[in-house]
A protein has these predicted regions:
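Start-transfer (signal-anchor) and selected internal transmembrane alpha helices
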Residues: 1-32, 226, 488-492, 496-504, ...
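Active-site-proximal, structured, solvent-exposed surfaces of multi-pass membrane proteins
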Residues: 2-4, 8, 677-820, 833
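Membrane-embedded helix bundles of polyisoprenyl
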Residues: 19, 113-126, 132-213, 226-246, ...
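Membrane-interface coil-to-helix junctions
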Residues: 22-117, 139-160, 249-254, 262-304
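Periplasmic/ER-lumenal interhelical loops and adjacent helix-loop junctions
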Residues: 46, 50-55, 224, 231-318, ...
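Soluble catalytic regions of membrane-associated enzymes that act on cell-envelope
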Residues: 95, 468-471, 499-732, 737-744, ...
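Contiguous transmembrane helix-bundle modules in multi-pass membrane proteins
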Residues: 177, 196, 328-388, 394, ...
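Membrane-interface helix-loop-helix junctions at transmembrane boundaries of multi-pass membrane enzymes
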Residues: 217-225, 312-334
């Protein structure tokens, strides 16, 4: 190992452990306070924790095909791939039993910050000669406002940590012809979260055009084609996860384009003000913000601890009149952030999100590293000049004294040296002038923003855009103090400025991240110990049968343990579930809708969990914990999943009925597609309220109990099947409240049957007598995805082997005295040149 390699590793270790320590300081206080546990708020407590715990158990038990507990049922891979299946931190958590997740998740957060710092350092160091400046910049990236605001979304942080590897791998390919790093960077970024892959592709395309194609033109096309080939290979290696996820997610109505007309070109004034706040203020609690917009989940924060955009403006000032790819990239980011349709492109035009802001944050950190390097270099030159000036002044005095035949006192010499040295040291460097200008500009913008919100009336209906004056005051002070300290340390301070600057930046990073954790916890979170007790206690419930659901929309009590429920929420679920709620006239977007009368009976939700005993009725099971107790009650009138109908009505007629009674009506009669009426009418008769009775709340219990006569028996439910026996008095249709995903196939008494879509659920024809009904499920795209991955692995292996052989031949063909030593050849400075 040469000195260069040893020094490089030292800086990598420094970057990792510096960010690791900052993460520990940010999280350790709350982990310690909660006896080793960690919880946060909202989505984190009721989604991220249950998802991780349930998926842990599901993977270890092999239940990874159909997820019965994800809402009303969904494809496990499709449902969980957006959140955790490709998430490195989740795979680390699999080393522990699921019940320990709340003990390790806080430390997993810390590791994410450490790795975000490490990967950002790896990319930034290629653009500066001073690795210590790159280390400082890694802290800016890892502890940006984006990382603080998005604490709620646990799975976002892995994306941020892996993103710099994408740029690093691409640079290695374009600049040095290194094959492989970009390929695997694409793989990791693709499987960690397919949603962010879209933004990665757009940003990388802009990066190629603005960094390589603009200055180099056609010369860069060879590298581009190599990059495209490696990108395809990287995606092929991830097809085992990407292809099933693609087939799954295209069913989701949240994946749609909703930009048109003038709103695609210009945001409203409020949104521009909100974007500016995300640059000025540290990341806030999404659901309870201090100003501009009270609650917003768009991830609109790109704050850099302490410095804000001061160093970005300073870098632009230093580069005035010079061409540089970073200028083009910053302009691209600015225009994209300000134009709605361009901003929306990063999420495939699906909603108003700003979840790509971690990308410009990396550029901001690089600007900071470049300014610090420039300042450090100029400061060293100034220090040497001051020393030379002091020596020259002393020499002149000594010569003058010798000419006069006098002896000069040492104090006079020291005074002259100090005066001359001070004169040089007080000179303002170009980098200091740039930082001063950046501080003035950014400070004026900050003051204008603060005073505007404090003193300007927004509208008659909403006079003030400040919702929490205390938090607004704190963040205003943090913003202005950071600008002031940046100016003070980088412009006014002449000695040990870098040490003081880094320590201050470190404090700001820890404070802003720790404050975000604190505010999230105080705004919404249940005490971690209480939440953990809730999880453990509900996990003791053991009386539930496979053919029934729980009437609940509480993820921690049901989804965590794989209990089927009527309202477990997840954003990524089978598209059939959306069709079901749409048929009921309900909207399902960021939460499961409140269940209407009859929904529990329709979906076979027989059980109810209560935390206090009812005055009437005996629970079928009682479990007690330290802070929580659960009483499990059942409704004997609820039929299991799988029961028959003797009447039908068409979907178009169903939509003409009262929305409030639609769930009861679905329980009363089979709601069929209009085009299937001719087939179904041969078996069932058309529903008539006059002859068959009305479907309303008063008749609900009787309607539900009527299905018990011909309901599922001998039920078997596995990860890829649902089977039961139904004894029918006559030919009819059996209904199953299982989402009609495209992967389902059905057979009755061994003969395959067409599945009838019932408002997103399933029904099959049954004959008079005993019917053995078997539903089997295969994940759409999984088999093809696995084959694609195997093919990609084979091509990748051949590609890398051939690349290595070609590299060896090229090395052997080079003259022995090519002019570079090994350490020089490996130096990142060579790539920078």
């Amino acid at each position: 190992m040469n000195d260069r390699t040893r020094k490089d590793r030292q800086y990598y270790r420094t970057a990792f452990f510096l960010n690791l320590a900052a993460g520990i300081f940010s999280f350790a206080w709350t982990i310690s306070d909660q006896r080793g546990l960690f919880s946060l708020a909202g989505d984190f407590d009721v989604q991220q924790i249950p998802f991780a715990m349930y998926a842990n158990d599901a993977i270890k038990s092999g239940n990874v095909i159909w997820d019965w507990s994800l809402d009303l049922g969904s494809n496990f891979i499709g449902g969980m791939s957006f959140y955790i299946l490709g998430n490195p931190s989740f795979w680390v958590s699999l080393l522990f039993p699921s019940r320990y997740f709340m003990f390790i998740v806080g430390w997993l957060y810390v590791l994410k910050y450490a790795f975000a710092g490490l990967t950002s350092f790896a990319w930034i160091r290629r653009h500066v000669s001073d690795e210590s400046s790159a280390v400082v910049a890694s802290l800016m990236y890892a502890f940006s406002g984006y990382m603080a605001e998005d604490l709620l979304f646990y799975h976002f942080h892995d994306v941020v940590a892996l993103f710099p590897l994408l740029l690093l791998g691409f640079d290695l390919l374009m600049q040095e012809g290194k094959k492989g790093p970009f390929l695997f960077a694409v793989l990791f970024n693709a499987i960690v979260n397919y949603y962010f892959l879209v933004g990665d592709v757009i940003f990388l395309a802009a990066y190629y055009v603005l960094r390589y194609f603009v200055p180099e033109g056609k010369k860069s096309l060879k590298g581009l084609f190599q990059g495209l080939f490696e990108a395809v290979l990287g995606c092929m290696l991830g097809l085992w996860l990407l292809l099933p996820s693609f087939f799954f997610v295209i069913q989701n109505p949240r994946v749609k384009m909703d930009y048109h007309g003038s709103n695609s070109l210009v945001f409203g004034a409020e949104r521009y003000l909100y974007i500016l706040k995300g640059l000025l203020f540290p990341g806030e609690v999404m659901s309870d913000q201090s100003a501009v917009i009270a609650h917003n989940f768009a991830s609109c924060s790109a704050y850099i601890p302490m410095v804000g955009l001061v160093l970005v403006i300073a870098w632009l000032e230093l580069m005035k009149g010079r061409k540089h790819w970073m200028k083009r990239m910053l302009l691209f980011c600015l225009v994209t952030a300000c134009v709605p349709i361009l901003n929306a492109a990063f999420s495939l035009f699906a909603g108003l999100y700003h979840r790509w802001y971690y990308m410009p944050t990396l550029l901001f950190a690089l600007c900071g590293a470049m300014v610090l390097e420039r300042k450090d270099r100029e400061d060293q030159i100034r220090t040497r000049r001051a020393e030379h000036a002091a020596n020259a002044a002393e020499l002149r005095l000594r010569r003058d004294a010798e000419d006069r035949g006098e002896e000069i006192p040492e104090e006079t010499l020291r005074s002259a040296r100090r005066e001359k040295s001070r004169e040089v040291l007080l000179e303002t460097l170009p980098s200091e002038r740039a930082v001063r200008k950046g501080a003035v500009i950014w400070g004026c913008i900050a003051l204008a923003f603060i005073f505007f919100l404090l003193f300007v009336k927004w509208s008659d209906s909403e006079p003030s855009k400040i919702y929490h004056i205390e938090e607004f005051t704190v963040w205003s002070c943090v913003c202005l103090l950071g600008i002031l300290l940046t100016w003070l340390f980088l412009v006014r301070l002449r000695s040990r400025w870098k040490t003081v600057f880094v320590l201050s930046l470190y404090f700001f990073a820890i404070f802003t991240m720790g404050a975000a954790v604190f505010l999230y916890q105080t705004a919404h979170a249940e005490d971690a110990r209480h939440h953990y007790d809730r999880l453990l206690t509900s996990g003791q419930i053991s009386c539930l049968k496979d053919e029934y659901r729980v009437n609940s929309n509480e993820n921690p009590e049901t989804l965590t343990h794989g209990f089927m429920a009527s309202g477990n929420f997840c954003s990524t679920v089978s598209g059939s579930i959306f069709r079901f709620y749409e048929a009921l006239g309900l909207k399902r977007d960021v939460r499961s809708p409140d269940p209407p009368e009859g929904l529990a009976e329709l979906v076979s939700a027989r059980y109810t969990f209560e935390e206090e005993a009812r005055e009437e009725g005996e629970p079928v099971q009682t479990v007690e914990g330290t802070w929580h107790s659960y009483y499990v009650y059942e409704d004997p009138s609820v039929a299991p999943i799988g029961f028959t109908y003797d009447t039908y009505m068409t979907y178009s007629d169903f939509l003409d009925t009262n929305k409030d009674n639609r769930a009861i009506l679905m329980l009363k009669t089979l709601v069929i597609p209009d085009e299937k009426e001719e087939v179904v009418s041969r078996v069932l008769r058309r529903y008539s309220a006059k002859e068959d009775g009305s479907a309303n709340k008063e008749h609900l219990s009787r309607i539900s109990a009527s299905h018990l006569e011909e309901a599922a028996e001998d039920v078997s439910r596995t990860t890829d099947s649902y089977s039961c026996t139904i004894r029918a008095a006559s030919d009819s249709y059996a209904f199953f409240s299982i989402p009609n995903d495209s992967g389902w196939k059905a057979s009755v008494n061994g003969e395959e049957q067409e599945i009838l879509d019932i408002c997103g659920f399933m029904a099959v024809p049954v004959s008079a007598g005993e019917n053995r009904i078997v539903f089997t499920y295969t994940v759409p795209g999984l088999a093809a995805g696995i084959l694609g991955t195997l093919a990609g692995a084979l091509i990748t292996a051949v590609y890398l082997v051939l690349s290595r052989k070609m590299k060896k031949r090229e090395a052997q063909a080079l003259p022995a005295d090519e002019g570079l030593t090994g350490s020089e050849a490996d130096s990142p400075a060579r790539a920078r040149r």
